């Protein structure tokens, strides 16, 4: 039995929304799907919705509170499945991110994985199916 329910998005809080959106575009070839400003004053949020461009893909939403402090980093782990893990890790570093855990081959599980951090310290899990 299949379900029409699916994972839709992950939101991460950021300080510099433009720089963070640029990082995810450069490192993971994401595209901007939409940009929103919602609410006013302390209730205001700004968000940029990013996607890989596939019609069935989930979205990554980077958002910030213009009138409030940004919550502590590390509040979410973002996961990406990629065709070439080494190339993607290099793209992360070139875009200003850092390697948190080097590539680990897990052939018994059918994948390789690395953990990286974006320029503001958000943890990202990158998986390549073997």
Predicted features and spans:
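Vicinal oxygen chelate
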Residues: 16-18, 73-123
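Conserved beta-strand in the GNAT
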Residues: 60-63, 115, 125
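Conserved positions in beta-strands of structured domains
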Residues: 31-33, 63, 100, 104
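Core segments of cupin and vicinal oxygen chelate
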Residues: 11-57
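N-terminal beta-strand motif that seeds the catalytic metal site of vicinal oxygen chelate
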Residues: 1-21, 75-78, 130
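Active-site beta-strand termini and strand-to-loop segments that position acidic
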Residues: 50-55, 116-119, 129
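Acetyl-CoA-dependent GNAT
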Residues: 34, 63-67, 129-130
């Amino acid at each position: 039995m299949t379900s029409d329910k699916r994972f839709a998005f992950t939101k991460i809080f950021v300080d510099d929304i433009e720089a963070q959106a640029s990082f995810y575009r450069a490192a993971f070839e994401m595209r901007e799907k939409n940009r929103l400003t919602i609410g006013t004053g302390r209730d205001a949020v700004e968000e940029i919705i990013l996607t890989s461009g596939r019609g069935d893909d989930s979205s990554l939403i980077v958002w910030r509170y213009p009138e409030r402090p940004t919550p502590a980093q590390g509040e979410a782990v973002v996961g990406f499945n990629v065709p070439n893990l080494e190339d993607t890790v290099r793209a992360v570093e070139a875009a200003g991110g850092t390697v948190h855990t080097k590539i680990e081959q897990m052939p018994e599980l059918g994948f390789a994985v690395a953990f990286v951090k974006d320029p503001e310290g958000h943890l990202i899990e990158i998986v390549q199916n073997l």
